């Protein structure tokens, strides 16, 4: 079918004028002719190793390219462009020359209506940028050749690749978006933040960003398994070297355009011929891709060429809606932006519908916006952590630990709590973050914690028995109290962030990490001053007392504590005292009516308060006392009342007992 169509096109082009043929060629090759119809190209000069039919030496230009460096093929299957020329010793000084060509006279275009020939003998030097591009192309071709060089190596690589991808991404329809986001976040242009655009076309999904263009190390990394350049770079959040492979779970043709790189991973490329693709690691074999031969809707997409990095995933029509739903699902809850270091703006373009999300700081608050409207607000704090020498020593022999962690002396743990109208919004079983969300929500945190966790290859689960993760959980338990204390002056409900009780523990499985959290958390809970008692002061939990009676709200904190004979403090008025019912505060002293009423009897300062306060407060006290009446307290209440100066004669107060005594005199 394709061959027949080619033949029909060739016949049709033979009837066209030279100008029409030239116009088609210039558009096809992405070359603009001058006023005389001359096209500028570059080619490699070669002297033939044999003579022509007349016994003369001759030469030719091969590897003909446009000035952008794309190899030129004639349309409709006529093969690569090649140009004949006379021998020229001066051209042997270097391989590549800039040349001028024109459409050959019609008598030479009987079989191929597009044949071109040299327009003149004015040869020039190619640009430095072109030389760089040719170097990049050479790298791509070498990787393609070397990867799976023997049949045995190819089969082993395929098996390893399939095992990894089956384990990682069999149940992760949208994981590839996170992996591409991570790559973009790890690739900022120096001094700039990163903006990402996802665009869904009729047959392709485009992922584009304005970060740093690919270099040789980046290319080597994505063309290998587990050989990530990020393993040694402490500024980058990834390190596995296999995240990019997630794009192949839904696409068999992936094109990358970045800087002077243009290549594809293509399961159906003609370069494989009739080979059994089950035995070829095509996901690791890059194929150089001339830009003028990109799929039409990608080639015509202006944004794809404007951004520094463009990735195109070919999507089957039946899967388009799945991609649309996966991305929409991610955009519905854009809190994944919280801990990304460099990505601050993200756009999803579906054609008629566009969704934009971004993050920005407003003082202590980090806001995430969706289409210009605040979607959520967060208080976030980062803690730089010194890594103890014993932890560093323990990491050295673990092959699962990236080199950047083995050499690191510092790491970072971050906390985030959602806030609305100045109050904490508790989250339900939030997942742990390793800059992007994992699937671990077993700990029931109502806040978000982010750290350099050692993750399984799919970036969704934690390595449970790794000493590094155990160390991080200890630090999280300790720092949680400090973070909460730092919020006490700005968020009155700050104590609600804390877990109600210690985390559930188990000997094996993910909750075995709870042991390390609980130990450090308990120690910090008892040793840190984090309960605010005034605008200026916070104290330890052993230094507070909780008024379960409500009396302090009537008579004031100072008098209440005097009645108790206590040098402790009552929590600040803005704190919701119900939080102290949680199990983590079970050691905090709680004062009940059974305790305080007997201590009020005969207390001189309380009597003075009673005399000097106003009628409203006295009435509030009476109502309070009535509300506490019950059989077990009645005797103490009666005794308290008998000793209260409830009778006033002139400016003098008398208790019931004093009044009766005076009357009997």
Annotated model-derived regions:
Residues 1, 77-80, 124-139, 145-149, ...:
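GHKL/Bergerat-fold ATPase module
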Residues 8-11, 15, 23-56:
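Structural detector for short beta-strands of small beta-barrel domains
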Residues 59-65:
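Short, acidic/hydrophobic/Gly-rich beta-strand patch recurrent on exposed beta strands
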Residues 68-91:
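Beta-strand/loop nucleic-acid-binding surfaces
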Residues 104-126:
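OB-fold/S1-family single-stranded nucleic acid-binding modules
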Residues 149-179:
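Conserved short strand/loop->alpha-helix "switch" segment adjacent to the catalytic nucleotide/phosphoryl-transfer site
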Residues 168-196, 243-250:
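Conserved ATP-binding N-box helix of the HATPase_c
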Residues 207-267, 271-273:
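Flexible ATP-lid and adjacent glycine-rich G1/G2 motifs of the Bergerat
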């Amino acid at each position: 079918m394709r061959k027949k169509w080619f033949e029909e096109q060739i016949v049709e082009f033979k009837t066209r004028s030279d100008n029409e043929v030239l116009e088609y060629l210039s558009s096809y090759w992405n070359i603009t002719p001058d006023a005389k119809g001359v096209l500028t190209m570059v080619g490699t000069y070669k002297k033939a190793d044999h003579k022509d039919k007349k016994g003369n030496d001759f030469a030719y230009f091969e590897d003909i390219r446009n000035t952008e460096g794309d190899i030129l093929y004639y349309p409709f299957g006529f093969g690569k462009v090649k140009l004949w020329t006379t021998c020229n010793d001066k051209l042997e000084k270097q391989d590549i020359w800039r040349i001028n060509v024109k459409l050959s006279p019609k008598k030479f275009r009987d079989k191929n209506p597009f044949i071109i020939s040299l327009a003149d003998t004015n040869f020039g030097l190619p640009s430095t940028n072109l030389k760089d591009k040719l170097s990049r192309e050479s790298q791509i071709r070498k990787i393609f050749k070397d990867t799976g060089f023997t049949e045995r190596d190819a089969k082993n690589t395929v098996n390893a690749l399939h095992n990894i991808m089956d384990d990682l991404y069999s149940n992760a329809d949208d994981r590839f978006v996170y992996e591409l986001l991570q790559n973009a976040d790890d690739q900022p242009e120096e001094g700039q933040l990163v903006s990402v655009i996802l665009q869904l076309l009729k047959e392709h999904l485009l992922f584009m960003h304005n970060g740093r263009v690919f270099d040789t190390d980046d290319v080597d990394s994505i063309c290998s398994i587990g050989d990530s350049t990020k393993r040694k770079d402490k500024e980058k959040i990834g390190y596995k070297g296999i995240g990019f492979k997630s794009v192949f779970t839904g696409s068999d043709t992936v094109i990358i355009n970045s800087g002077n790189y243009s290549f594809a991973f293509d399961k159906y490329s003609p370069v494989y011929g009739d080979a059994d693709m089950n035995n070829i690691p095509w996901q690791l074999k890059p194929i150089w891709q001339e830009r003028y031969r990109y799929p039409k809707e990608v080639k015509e997409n202006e944004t794809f060429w404007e951004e520094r990095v463009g990735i195109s995933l070919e999507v089957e029509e039946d899967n388009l809606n799945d991609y649309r739903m996966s991305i929409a699902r991610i955009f519905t809850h854009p809190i994944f932006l919280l801990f990304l270091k460099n990505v601050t703006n993200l756009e999803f373009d579906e054609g008629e519908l566009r969704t934009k999300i971004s993050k920005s700081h407003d003082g202590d608050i980090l806001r995430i916006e969706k289409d210009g409207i605040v979607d959520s607000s967060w208080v976030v704090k980062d803690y730089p952590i010194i890594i103890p020498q014993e932890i560093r020593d323990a990491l050295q022999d673990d092959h699962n630990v990236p080199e950047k962690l083995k050499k690191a002396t510092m790491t970072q743990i971050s906390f985030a709590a959602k806030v609305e109208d100045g109050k904490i919004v508790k989250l339900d079983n939030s997942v742990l973050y390793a800059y992007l969300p994992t699937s671990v929500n077993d700990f029931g945190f109502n806040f978000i914690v982010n750290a350099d966790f050692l993750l399984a290859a799919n970036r969704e689960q934690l390595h449970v028995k790794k000493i590094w993760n155990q160390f991080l959980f200890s630090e999280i338990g300790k720092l949680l109290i400090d973070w909460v204390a730092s919020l006490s002056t700005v968020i009155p409900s700050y104590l609600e962030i804390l877990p109600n009780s210690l985390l559930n523990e188990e000997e094996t499985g993910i909750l075995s990490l709870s042991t390390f959290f609980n130990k450090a958390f308990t120690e910090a809970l008892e040793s840190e001053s984090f309960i605010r008692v005034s605008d200026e002061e916070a104290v330890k939990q052993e230094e507070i007392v909780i008024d379960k009676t409500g009396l302090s709200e009537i008579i004031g904190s100072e008098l209440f504590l005097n009645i108790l004979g206590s040098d402790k403090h009552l929590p600040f008025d803005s704190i919701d005292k119900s939080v102290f019912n949680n199990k983590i505060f079970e050691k905090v002293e709680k004062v009940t009516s059974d305790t305080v009423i007997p201590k009020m009897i005969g207390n001189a300062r309380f009597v003075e308060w009673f005399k000097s306060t106003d009628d409203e407060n006295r009435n509030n006290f009476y109502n309070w006392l009535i509300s506490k009446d019950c059989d077990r307290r009645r005797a103490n209440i009666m005794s308290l009342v008998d000793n209260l100066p409830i009778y006033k004669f002139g400016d003098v107060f008398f208790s019931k007992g004093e009044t009766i005594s005076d009357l009997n005199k």
